[in-house]
């Protein structure tokens, strides 16, 4: 017999650990599951086991749905992991692993990145700039880029798997990527230089319902998704707490401070 409770679901993908959490309408945890994220080699680079993460998630959701009604689903994920989807709606890469040393294999990236005051993104090593990952693929794997219809951020990759709808989202797209112009609120000059303007789906709000997935007797609303630490920051920003500093911990420590002025950043 199924309980009357309607559950909301959060898939929280960290670089090391994955959590799938089921909440009731009072935000009390009813069920939770844990897994690990792993990587392998494909097309000569490190890629994450994102398709397996999706299948694991779907299997757990189906199991819980036998006892509970389901309401909404949202995915949060760590930054700098991108899926490449071809024109037949198949994965070419899902998803890139930022621990691959992209910076060792290509030159010239530093010459074409936007100014700091455009993207507010420092130049980082390995794949910690999504723009560097895409620059590498454009230089070393042009055949993959030609086959690519869309680049999907990790949360929106999961959303696409759930709904078959393509979207982007600003908290992820702008998170140390070199891909977003914060002053003009649009894709950056780097995207234009690489001629990738049409390879990013339209931006939607993180909290927008993108589609509905039928699972058992439930019609599960699929929310667009968001970068994990930004989701934590938004929660406290919308609370009554003022002038706070947030430390988001896990594989990385990310620090947010409301008082910092963008003019002071270099």
Model-derived segments and spans:
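Active-site phosphate-binding/coordination module
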Residues: 67-130
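Short, hydrophobic/amphipathic alpha-helical packing segments
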Residues: 54-62, 131-134, 227-234
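A short acidic-Thr-Gly-centered motif at the start of a beta-strand
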Residues: 1-3, 212-217, 236-241
